């Protein structure tokens, strides 16, 4: 991966560094995209569809869910940060969030760890079902920090396809446990 300007997207500098290569891709209408995926003509990762802006109904739903769940989320993020801090002791923690679902949780964990005085770094990296993880991004993280403090963060587990990709991707890379952290 070439040296690059730090990209943080809509997050604050210091919350996450995305190790992604910018690409330009033509938008595919959702119905056409679904047809191409179902027919096997294209992989889901080869296409993007324009996402509409959230409606007021969606925004209201989000705010109601946030109001109901914020306290629990804060408690659980704090518990996870404490567990990581205890597990790693004085060793810095390197959060490798799987884009996109892992990044919001990774940002919250990174902030919680910093608030506890724990040294941590946070990266957003790509992993795609049936295609694997971005090896160049892992190379950058490993070169900067080694492998012993890396913790992978995902915010969506679904049926486990991405977990399987992660296990397969790390199997032949030295320094990782059999089951990723």
Residue spans for each PLM region:
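PRPP-associated nucleotide enzymes
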Residues: 1-181
């Amino acid at each position: 991966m070439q040296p690059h300007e730090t990209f943080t997207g809509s997050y604050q500098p210091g919350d996450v560094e995305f190790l992604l290569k910018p690409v330009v891709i033509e938008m595919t209408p959702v119905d056409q995209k679904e047809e191409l995926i179902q027919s096997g003509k294209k992989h889901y990762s080869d296409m993007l569809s324009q996402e509409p802006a959230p409606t007021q109904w969606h925004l209201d739903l989000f705010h109601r869910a946030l109001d109901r769940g914020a306290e629990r989320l804060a408690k659980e993020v704090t518990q996870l940060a404490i567990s990581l801090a205890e597990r790693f002791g004085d060793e810095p923690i390197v959060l490798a969030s799987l884009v996109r679902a892992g990044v919001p949780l990774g940002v919250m964990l990174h902030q919680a760890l910093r608030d506890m005085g724990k040294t941590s770094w946070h990266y957003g990296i790509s992993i795609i079902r049936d295609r694997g993880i971005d090896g160049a991004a892992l190379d950058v993280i490993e070169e900067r920090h080694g492998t012993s403090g890396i913790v992978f963060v995902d915010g969506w587990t679904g049926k486990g396809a991405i977990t399987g990709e992660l296990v397969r991707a790390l199997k032949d890379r030295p320094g990782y446990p059999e089951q990723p952290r």
